[in-house]
């Protein structure tokens, strides 16, 4: 096991710890988290370590552990979100993090709730932003704050929170923050469920039901060569067959979360994203797609599955199910 990271609770402690590294010209890596660390977070720390190591000289990796109240809605799980700092320190030690920054709310927001925040713009109003108003304003504000406190050269985020990743990249571009954003692949359980700190809320039966999300995405990925409509049909079929899954949205977009064009050329990259509740736990997931290259054997449609055509009776979804739009995307019904 690597040596234990140094724990900093205040911005002054953090600045002192980073000063020597900056004087040596070392790069600084940041992994922002809300704690309750798991193997997905561990992979982010490893990615940060790799990016700040140059010719054997290792710059410091900072892991922030801060449950940010600004990104929780009134009826969300702020109070019960797991706080496991001692266990988090063990994960950070194992993965070679140098500093764990675990500030209080007053340390991050010394003037109380901030009066100046980062507005996410149009990209923050769709998907998660539509379901969780104000969420991304809180996320971007705290990330900008952490960038100011740590002043990292590199920051690592997971692709599981894909919309968040896209918004952070946009914020860095629009505000010229000068931080390299590294996207790390989603880490999954053996059965495909994306790792999440909220998975611990799931009862055993709900845990089994939750795998339907990744099964749906894989079904879409396997059939994306037939086009977006078929991919969505296959994903819907998996979700409909799964008990206990309450769908918020299922959507295929381009990699930047814009709508697909009306005509999708073969080999067009895309992203499928899903959000659903299993019991009282809200889960999200996503996968990349490559659209329009037809099936592996050149079939025009997938075997053993009749799919609906746009405008057919099958498109009359009940609330919460996916609905197809003319662009080939899909979003949850109101």
Swiss-Prot record:
> Residues that bind ATP, according to the entry?
34-41, 158-161, 187, 195-198
Report the GO terms under cellular component: cytosol
Give GO MF terms, alphabetically: ATP binding; pantoate-beta-alanine ligase activity
Residues binding beta-alanine are 71
Which GO BP terms, alphabetically?
pantothenate biosynthetic process
> Keyword Secreted on this protein?
no
- Compartment annotation: Cytoplasm
Catalyses:
(R)-pantoate + beta-alanine + ATP = (R)-pantothenate + AMP + diphosphate + H(+)
Chain intervals with Polar residues compositional bias? 313-334
EC number of the protein: 6.3.2.1
| UniProt keyword annotation of Nucleus present | no
Instruction: Please give the SUPFAM superfamilies that the UniProt record associates with this protein.
Output: Nucleotidylyl transferase (SSF52374)
Pathways involved: Cofactor biosynthesis; (R)-pantothenate biosynthesis; (R)-pantothenate from (R)-pantoate and beta-alanine: step 1/1
Q: What UniProt keywords are attached to this protein's entry?
A: ATP-binding, Cytoplasm, Ligase, Nucleotide-binding, Pantothenate biosynthesis
Sites binding (R)-pantoate sit at 71, 164
Positions of the region Disordered?
288-334
Q: Which domain of life is it from?
A: Bacteria
Q: Where is the active site?
A: 41 (proton donor)
What InterPro entries does this protein's entry cite? Pantoate_ligase, Pantoate_ligase_C, Rossmann-like_a/b/a_fold
User: What binding partners and quaternary form does the record give?
Assistant: Homodimer.
Q: Additional comments on file?
A: The reaction proceeds by a bi uni uni bi ping pong mechanism.
Q: Which family does the record assign?
A: Belongs to the pantothenate synthetase family.
The protein's job, in short, is:
Catalyzes the condensation of pantoate with beta-alanine in an ATP-dependent reaction via a pantoyl-adenylate intermediate.
Q: What is this protein called?
A: Pantothenate synthetase
Encoding gene (name): panC
């Amino acid at each position: 096991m690597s040596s234990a990271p140094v724990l900093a609770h205040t911005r002054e402690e953090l600045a002192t710890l980073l000063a020597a590294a900056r004087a040596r010209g070392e790069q600084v890596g940041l992994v922002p988290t809300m704690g309750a660390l798991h193997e997905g977070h561990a992979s982010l720390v490893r990615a940060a370590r790799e990016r700040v190591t140059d010719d054997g000289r290792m710059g410091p990796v900072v892991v922030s552990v801060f449950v940010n109240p600004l990104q929780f809605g009134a009826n969300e799980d702020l109070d019960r979100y797991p706080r496991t700092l001692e266990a988090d320190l063990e994960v950070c030690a194992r993965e070679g993090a140098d500093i764990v920054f675990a500030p209080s709310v007053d340390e991050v927001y010394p003037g109380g709730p901030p009066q100046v925040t980062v507005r996410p713009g149009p990209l923050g109003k769709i998907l998660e932003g539509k379901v969780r108003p104000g969420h991304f304003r809180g996320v971007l504000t705290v990330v900008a704050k952490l960038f100011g406190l740590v002043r990292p050269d590199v920051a690592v985020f997971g692709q599981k929170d894909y919309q968040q990743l896209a918004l952070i990249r946009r914020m860095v571009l629009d505000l010229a923050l000068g931080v390299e954003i590294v996207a790390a692949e989603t880490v999954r359980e053996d059965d495909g469920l994306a790792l999440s700190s909220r998975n611990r809320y799931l009862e055993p039966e709900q845990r089994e039901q939750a795998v339907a999300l990744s099964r749906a995405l894989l079904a879409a990925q396997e059939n994306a060569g037939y086009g977006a409509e078929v991919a969505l049909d296959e994903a819907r079929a998996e979700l409909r067959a799964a008990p206990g899954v309450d769908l918020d949205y299922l959507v295929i977009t381009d990699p930047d979360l814009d709508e697909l064009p009306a005509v999708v050329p073969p080999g067009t990259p895309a992203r499928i994203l899903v959000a659903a509740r299993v019991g009282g736990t809200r889960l999200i997931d996503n996968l990349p797609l490559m659209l329009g290259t037809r099936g592996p054997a050149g079939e025009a449609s997938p075997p053993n599955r009749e799919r609906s055509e746009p405008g057919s009776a099958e498109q009359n979804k009940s609330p919460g199910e996916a609905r197809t739009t003319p662009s080939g995307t899909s979003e949850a019904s109101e």
